Amino acid sequence: MSRYTGPRLKIIRRFGGLDLPGLTRKRPKNTNPPGMHGAERKKKSEYAIRLEEKQKVRFNYGLSERQMIRYMRKARRSKGSTGLALLQMLEMRLDCIVFRLGMAPTIPAARQLVSHGHIEVNGQKVTIPSYGCKVGDVITVKNKESSRKLVAAYAEYPGLFLPDYLEFDKEKLRGRIKELPPREQICAPVNELLVVEFYSRKL
């Protein structure tokens, strides 16, 4: 299953108007799922509930199913909570870090910045959105007028709160990762335990 590139508000409606900040900052006027008129909904099976949680993660972080499986396998090999390890790996992707720093309004916009060569990590240009950042990494904008103007305009966009595990100098357009993100500062409205349960029968 490839990464979703269709209408984003349609996905938000599918989840009853749930806020997925990585996908879009817009809000639909109608929060009923597409094709459903009125508020009546069928009771979901346990499988459907787990599937929905998995899909929330996929759409919020802009992942393909193949990428999800790869991250899940890595998370299962890590120490501690598999669910937390999964979310931390996703949050430490370069496109997500750029988004959390406020350099882009959404993860898709951050992904475009990275792939077009506007972002550097520790002084080196990185064009892979899935690049796994590490604690201590310094994320900056390429020292080019067009790059700095683009990110400066994005930085004026009313974004999410800057989490404590990051620091950002708005004048220099420079960010640094201070520590791994704790669960309470990961703005992903998902139940990661259900995501782990979903894949436990598949991997």
Swiss-Prot record:
Q: Enumerate the GO terms in the molecular function aspect.
A: rRNA binding; structural constituent of ribosome
Q: Which residues form the S4 RNA-binding domain?
A: 92-155
User: Any keyword Ribosomal protein?
Assistant: yes
Q: Which SUPFAM superfamilies match?
A: Alpha-L RNA-binding motif
Species assigned in the record: Synechococcus sp. (strain JA-2-3B'a(2-13)) (Cyanobacteria bacterium Yellowstone B-Prime)
Q: Family assignment? A: Belongs to the universal ribosomal protein uS4 family.
One GO BP annotation is: translation
Keyword hit for Heme: no
Keyword list, A-Z? Ribonucleoprotein, Ribosomal protein, RNA-binding, rRNA-binding
What highest taxon heads this organism's lineage? Bacteria
Q: Which CDD domains does its entry note?
A: S4
Give Gene Ontology CC terms: small ribosomal subunit
Renumbered to this chain, region (Disordered) spans: 20-44
In Swiss-Prot or TrEMBL terms, this protein is called Small ribosomal subunit protein uS4
Q: Which residues cross the membrane?
A: none
Q: What does this protein do?
A: One of the primary rRNA binding proteins, it binds directly to 16S rRNA where it nucleates assembly of the body of the 30S subunit. With S5 and S12 plays an important role in translational accuracy.
User: Which InterPro entries does this entry report, sorted A to Z?
Assistant: Ribosomal_uS4 (IPR022801), Ribosomal_uS4_bac-type (IPR005709), Ribosomal_uS4_CS (IPR018079), Ribosomal_uS4_N (IPR001912), S4_RNA-bd (IPR002942), S4_RNA-bd_sf (IPR036986)
Q: Check the record and name the SMART domains matching this protein.
A: Ribosomal_S4, S4
